[in-house]
Amino acid sequence: MSSRPLEGKLAVVTGAFRGIGAAITKHLAAKGANVLGVYTSDSSTQSANDLINALQEAHGVKIVAVQADLSDSEESPRRIVEAAQAMFGHSENLTVNILVNNAGVGGDYPLGEVPMAEFHRIYAVNVLAPIMVTQALLPFLPRDRSGRIVNISSVASTMGFKTHTLYGGTKAALEAMTRTWARELAERATVNAVNPGPVEGDMYWAAGEDFWKQLEPFQLAAPLSAVRDTDRPELVRLANEKMAGRRPAYWTEVADIVGMLCGPESAWCTGSVVCANGGLRFSV
């Protein structure tokens, strides 16, 4: 098998330059894909430029960033399509081979304290944006089943964590849409979701000790979450002190599974939620 099985393919990745998204961008570029990466905040501009330069130099691929506010369901899809057309070809010859709907926002609220504004904010980014971005790119998907769509969900869709009325609800919606799209787009692309558990990053550290305590019984049952000597010393220390000796996933561990679903070898897998959580959930 080629070490660059995605040579010449075009991937669109939302939330492409931070956390899991940056790891996905790196993974796809290393396999030869050109990447149109979408980011929202000005604070990501420098990190996007740095990653673009590093990946283009390392892998000889084309990486382009487009800034688009995914909470704007009309403007952001238009900007993404225009950027793809400008950099990778006009409508008549543009093909988007891979779409990774990764961007997401969180918000933890007990049921009695859910603000209406937060409902609209979180559902706009986590549910409506994947719908509208996928819809906008639909004309450019392959017509031979070779396309790949991967939606980044979460174990929050099924675990019933306290305070996850909004976040867990959006991820359950995304998984339901994954199954629908797998049928609707069967002649164009496979459509799957990946459901990480705890992942090292801003959202995980911001959740704090109360949430880590809620996770503890689930993490203790996850066979791959136990820290080892090969893990980063500071993470081992923190896990042993605060997390019952269990660690969150590294970004690359999730990105590798996403990459598997983007490759030609995943052609017979569609409509599935593929676990990427160290065994916190046992299912496909």
Predicted features along the sequence, with ranges:
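Conserved glycine-rich cofactor-binding loop
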Residues: 10, 17-18
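Conserved glycine-rich Rossmann-like NAD(P)H-binding loop of the short-chain dehydrogenase/reductase
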Residues: 33-49
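Active-site helix of classical SDR
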Residues: 134, 170, 178
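Substrate-binding pocket helix/loop in short-chain dehydrogenase/reductase
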Residues: 110-111, 115-120, 149, 211-215, ...
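Alpha-helical segment proximal to the catalytic Tyr-Lys
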Residues: 139, 182-187, 267
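Residue(s) in the substrate-gating loop at a strand-loop-helix junction
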Residues: 154
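Short C-terminal tail/terminal secondary-structure segment
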Residues: 2, 111, 159, 241, ...
